[in-house]
Amino acid sequence: MGADAERRRGAPRVAVAADADVLRRLFREYRASLGDAGEHLVGFDEEVAALPGGFDLVLVAGDLGCVALRRVHEHACEMKRLYVRPAARGTGAGRELILALIEHARAGGYTVMYLDTLPSMVAAGSLYRSLGFVETKRYNDNPAPGVRFMELQL
């Protein structure tokens, strides 16, 4: 299947410079979806300006959603900015993005993937648990109230 067909279908793929505008829209929608908690995203505007750079990897699923990967240390990475537009929720797009990110992380030699999430993100928390993520100790300095930390052994 060609790249144009994959973009329309929304299959997760590695983002390239041509995806910058879509990624910026998705990231801004992500922040807006967090409500007041979006105020705690330190360095967010710089992240958006640098897209698709600023992360070790960004995956995009057409204009349906995105997810990013950031190195924590030699063997650990962090899932960041998973976002699926409301119209695409419940279609499996989020699961596909995460599974693709996990594949890339394993191929990159990572043995653990971390993420942080908020109690208000109930569906996301359920999805993470269904994929094997478990609660873990704090691994970053996220200042958001009530933030929860999870990990997946890869």
Q: What is the predicted function of each stretch?
A:
Residues 2, 148-154:
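Terminal substrate-recognition subdomain of acyl/acetyltransferases
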Residues 91, 95, 99:
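Residues forming the Rossmann-fold NAD(P)(H) cofactor-binding site
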Residues 1-7:
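Actinobacteria-biased recognition of intrinsically disordered, low-complexity terminal regions
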Residues 42, 114-122, 129-150:
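Conserved catalytic-core motifs of GNAT/GCN5-like acyltransferases
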Residues 97, 121-124:
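Conserved short alpha-helix immediately C-terminal to the canonical SAM/SAH-binding motif I
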Residues 8-10, 14-80, 85-86, 98-100, ...:
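Acetyl-CoA-dependent GNAT
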Residues 85-91, 119-120:
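Active-site acidic-Proline motif in GNAT/NAT acetyltransferases
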Residues 105-117:
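Conserved GNAT acetyl-CoA-binding A-motif
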